[in-house]
Amino acid sequence: LSPDIKKIRDYCKRKKIILIEDNCESLGAKFEKKYLGTYGDFGTFSFFYSHQITSGEGGMIICKKKEDYEILKSLRSHGWSRDEKTSRKYPHLDPRYVFINSGFNLRPTDIQAAIGISQFKKLEKFRSIRSENREKIINSLKSNAKWKNQFHFIDVPKKVSPSYMVFPIIL
C-alpha cells in the first residue's frame, strides 16, 4: 500500500532531496489516480518472474530530466555514451569507444523486450485479477468460523489503488 507520496515528494522538494520511488512490487498501483513511480525524480520497476508482469528478468527506471535519462542510458550500456554532445567534445576519439561512466550491461534482449511489451498490455487485467484474489482470500478467511477472529486486514485508503503482488495480514 502506498503512503501519502505527495507529502513525501513535497518534503523532498523542500529539503532538496532526490526522490527515488522503489515500485518494484507495485507496478500499476496509483495514489490519487496517478501512477506510483511518477511522483519522484526517478521511479524503479522490476520485471522479475514473480512480479506483476515479467520479461524473465530485468526492470525499468523512469525519470523526468533529459540529463538523467542520458546518464541512465549510459550506465545500462557499460558507461558508453551515444550522446552527440559527448562525440563533439571528443572529436579525435572514435565514438564507439568513448565511455563516460562506469557502467553495466543491463540492456534487455529483443525477446525480453517483446515479452515485456506483451505483458504491459495485460497489466490492468492482471491488477484487477490480483485485487479479486485478495478479496476472495479475505472473504474466505472471514467466513471460516475457525479463522474469522484470527486474522485482521489493513483497510485500503480510498485514494490508493494498489497493485497487489502480496498483501499484509495481521495475526
Task: Outline where the language-model segments fall.
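PLP-dependent aminotransferase class I/II
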Residues: L1-R14, K30, K66-L171
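Active-site phosphate-binding strand-loop segment of PLP-dependent enzymes
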Residues: L1-S55, M60-D68
